[in-house]
């Protein structure tokens, strides 16, 4: 067997020049291949190099995946947003006719595995650094943070594609002695969904003892690990709702609380607030928050246009507080089949335009509702309703009651739709609760007509195709059903 010199690694990065991005060329950039480089067992030798590896993990929040795709995937594939813009790759995705050569799909695969590789560098090599200024305690903390982040990225990947390769070693150089090991890295097989979730849980549970304190809102903290664990146990095949309750019990001891003013979550003046569990810290530097320009503004047709459905949901509920914080209407120079140019809606949760916009990876209201979902599944309808009503009381809405499992799931889904609109959650909520095909196949326009593309959704479309470019390069990868 001969290993081609030009092997394309699974670990790919992507480059983006924000200043040159327009709605027509969004997502059309090609990834940059990370080539093999010789590495010893001690490629990093100083505390400064170790801290640089950690900085790289967090600076990934400036990447296109986090600044744009995460929100597009979670809302434009659901009933809270239309695709917006004019990019055909986006239209495929938002209309449930995605194909294996879609560049959004390949870029997100490359980005997620690139992020995982950044985590693996810390996990593989930080223990070998002998610099005395890098303490044993700091090494443990670094590894805990990297483990939480790796788990988060595998959690995203397994929800998007199902079975995915499990790679736990950083890219290494190729030589005759390590050929078989490198071959398995370069040409990995897909692990089962159960195996992926096992690694995710192991990473998160193993990180709890050494993770930064939950008061560190901008780091992968103990609270972040608890929050992700709760979501993982609610989402994995054969969910463990007792575990969800247990981890949200622990989360409740970490000092989090709901902000009394909903808009303070998004106004830029209350960063690292009491409700924030894990917050990406836009700083106009290493994390330049450019997503705002993709979602709001009248200079060109933006992405993630709020849907008639979500605006109607706010109106029907009398939810003026969250509607005003979530959606803003402007006069624009264009019109489409959904909205008139005189009152065109934009997402309003990301509204800071100086590069310092933050966003939430996890916040407490989200986890209260995940806990409520678990309570419903366990038959505690009164306890579930009490949790939902905490969230509703914050915005002046009357309490609900829950009478059955289906009633509870439907009411919690509606509450999550209103509370977490445009935060990248809806697609995954619908999948997790088994409601995606039922709800998305009946999506309607502002006149009550079922959207022409709604019939495209089916069970196969709930997972993305494995990127064709990866299959072409890797004989061990198989395609998802229906692609």
Give the ranges of each region predicted by the language model:
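Conserved, well-structured interaction surfaces
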Residues: 46-55, 59-60, 87-161, 186-195, ...
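Short, solvent-exposed loop/beta-turn-alpha elements that line the ligand-binding surface or hinge
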Residues: 80, 85-108, 128, 176-188, ...
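Sec-dependent bacterial lipoprotein signal peptides
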Residues: 1-21
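Short, surface-exposed recognition loops and adjoining beta-strand edges that mediate ligand/DNA contacts
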Residues: 67-90, 164-175, 212-294, 399-407, ...
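TPR-repeat structural position
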Residues: 197, 239-241, 381
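Flexible, polar/acidic helix-loop-strand segments at domain edges
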Residues: 97, 170, 312-363
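Membrane-proximal, proline-rich intrinsically disordered regions
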Residues: 3, 23-72, 453-483
